């Protein structure tokens, strides 16, 4: 999850975009808001989880809206408390290293180049409507290199059924991939 902004709509003020991307399916959820207050982020996360399902982990940067308060640095903010309440483990990337969250940063670039810079928005309401249209289009049509057809051929998937040594870090990913292919 990442927060993009502030961005500006000519004659209608600023907005922020909360972008969430599922690392396995590359489905996205885009939520625009006027402010980056933690209650807006928390409400957006609830809508995201209702739409996409609740994840096991949520990788986030150290944005103040995500982590809590500078005034009370040892207290948990609303977004963190929401994650913990629903059993979602927040994973923070190191400060000043956005490349550690490369998948969502790549989507932010796609959002900027293929959506925000290619259209003119007369109002914030129009932007919210069009961002949901972009979200639906992206989830249906946009493909990343990891989902290329050559990687989905059966001969490349033979390793999924192989037994890995105990404690091998691919075990969890293989289980997730098996459930992904079993459902399709």
What are these regions (language model features)?
Residues 3-17, 23-126, 132, 136-137:
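RNase H-like DDE/DDD metal-dependent nuclease/strand-transfer catalytic core used by mobile genetic elements
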Residues 112-184:
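C-terminal domain-tail junction helix/linker
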